[in-house]
Amino acid sequence: MEFKHVLMILGVIILILAPLIMYSGLGEDEGYFGGADGAAGDLIMEISPNYEPWFEPFWEPPSGEIESLLFALQAAIGAIIIGYFFGYNKAKYEDKN
């Protein structure tokens, strides 16, 4: 195996392990990872306590796991579409040459 391949594999391993090593679990109780939606909702209620939303969602996932599944499915479908687009254009370019 060439040296540049070994370096690339080591780089990928470091990129995978670094966040796991750096994460200590601190801050979850303080809401550091609450997300933008929760922070925006809190800020709106602070600015205007009588604010009423214009509409409600017609369906809400029964659990956080299903919500995460739907988000991951949406990301996978988007990745497939983008991959198809790149593959189609690459094949079209190679066909010209």
UniProtKB/Swiss-Prot annotation:
Keyword tags: Cell membrane, Cobalamin biosynthesis, Cobalt, Cobalt transport, Ion transport, Membrane, Transmembrane, Transmembrane helix, Transport
Metabolic or biological pathway: Cofactor biosynthesis; adenosylcobalamin biosynthesis
Membrane topology designation: Multi-pass membrane protein
Main location, first listed in the record: membrane
InterPro entries for this protein: CbiN (IPR003705)
Stretches that traverse the bilayer: 6-26, 68-88
Pfam families in the cross-refs: CbiN (PF02553)
A GO term from the CC aspect: plasma membrane
Location within or outside the cell: Cell membrane
GO biological process: cobalamin biosynthetic process
Key word Amino-acid biosynthesis present: no
Annotated GO MF terms: cobalt ion transmembrane transporter activity
Function as written in the Swiss-Prot or TrEMBL entry: Part of the energy-coupling factor (ECF) transporter complex CbiMNOQ involved in cobalt import.
Family: Belongs to the CbiN family.
HAMAP family found in the cross-reference section: CbiN (MF_00330)
Quaternary structure and partners: Forms an energy-coupling factor (ECF) transporter complex composed of an ATP-binding protein (A component, CbiO), a transmembrane protein (T component, CbiQ) and 2 possible substrate-capture proteins (S components, CbiM and CbiN) of unknown stoichimetry.
Name of the molecule in the record: Cobalt transport protein CbiN
Organism lineage string: Archaea, Methanobacteriati, Methanobacteriota, Methanomada group, Methanococci
